[in-house]
């Protein structure tokens, strides 16, 4: 079973759309222990500096990137389960994305889809996929084949 308390999301920018915020809150209630840190929009350099101050050296860093590795929901659940409860930090860029140097620091880069999404929707999708991964590893009814 996934231990969500080992996961953190660093997201650049505020959620402005109410319906997205409501969706995020719904999943966060189902994922107690998942930490979400929101960083103010700024230049990529300032955002990178802030992110580097937040993360620690023992964290497994995953950046969301359209060129990252794609997984099915079951593959993602398996990859997370095989991380053996490492502290995993997911980083979602703002409107300008993440700097290449920050992406290069990542242990791996994750693509949620070959499509490009606004950062607000990417945050909702990631949190939903973490909930789905937890349900898959628990054998719960949420994930349908």
Swiss-Prot record:
Gene3D superfamilies, per the entry: 3.40.1280.10
Signal peptide from the UniProt entry: none
Species assigned in the record: Prochlorococcus marinus (strain NATL2A)
GO terms, molecular function: rRNA (pseudouridine-N3-)-methyltransferase activity
UniProt keyword annotation of Electron transport present: no
Protein name in the entry: Ribosomal RNA large subunit methyltransferase H
Reaction(s) this enzyme catalyzes, per UniProt: pseudouridine(1915) in 23S rRNA + S-adenosyl-L-methionine = N(3)-methylpseudouridine(1915) in 23S rRNA + S-adenosyl-L-homocysteine + H(+)
Gene (name only): rlmH
Residues that coordinate or bind S-adenosyl-L-methionine: 64, 93, 112-117
Oligomer and partners: Homodimer.
Biological function: Specifically methylates the pseudouridine at position 1915 (m3Psi1915) in 23S rRNA.
Record keyword Glycosyltransferase present: no
InterPro entries tied to this protein: Alpha/beta_knot_MTases, RlmH-like, tRNA_m1G_MTases_N
UniProt keywords, alphabetically: Cytoplasm, Methyltransferase, rRNA processing, S-adenosyl-L-methionine, Transferase
Similarity remark: Belongs to the RNA methyltransferase RlmH family.
One GO cellular component term: cytoplasm
Subcellular location: Cytoplasm
